[in-house]
Regions:
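Conserved sequence signature across two-component system core domains
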Residues: 8-9, 32, 50
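Two-component/phosphorelay signaling modules centered on CheY-like receiver
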Residues: 12-30, 100
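Acidic catalytic/metal-coordinating carboxylates
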Residues: 34-37, 59-66
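Active-site beta3 strand of CheY-like receiver
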Residues: 45-51
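A Lys-centered signature of the CheY-like receiver
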Residues: 53, 57, 104-106
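The feature encodes the CheY-like receiver
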Residues: 57-58, 87
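Alpha4 helix (beta4-alpha4-beta5 surface) of REC/receiver domains from two-component response regulators
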Residues: 63, 85-103, 109-115
Length: 121
């Protein structure tokens, strides 16, 4: 069965980009556009990995991350944060999840796939 990745980003352009980057993989993608939608979708299905944007209008990425890590059913699910902001801005989130991975919005296909495979195969 294909591993599932939930993409949480309020920008359709990045959803399209990640879909294109991962189109030659066997991963199944779930697209949600804000934190509230992500939390609702989690009632239906649990992904194997999250790709999370930090700068979103409705609920910021760090708030979403804190919610996810406070949920027993999600606390072990890996999160890859992809942001255009400097990593240092979110350094304190490593205390919540020491395995958190930060990637720049300009991440290459190869790097993104490498990081995903390292976490969920």
């Amino acid at each position: 069965m294909a591993k599932t990745i939930m993409i949480i980003d309020d920008d359709q352009v990045f959803h399209d980009l990640y879909t294109e980057m991962l189109e030659d993989t066997d991963y199944r993608l779930i697209h949600v556009y804000d934190g509230d939608e992500a939390l609702l979708k989690l009632e239906e299905e649990k992904p194997d990995l999250f790709i999370l944007d930090m700068l979103m209008d409705m609920m910021t990425g760090d708030t979403v991350l804190l919610y996810l890590k406070s949920m027993p059913e999600c606390e072990e699910i890996p999160i890859i944060v992809i942001s255009g902001q400097p990593k240092q801005r979110y350094k304190s989130l490593k205390e919540v999840d020491p395995n958190l991975i930060f990637l720049d919005k300009t991440v290459t296909n190869e790097k993104l796939i490498q990081e995903i495979k390292a976490r969920i195969g």
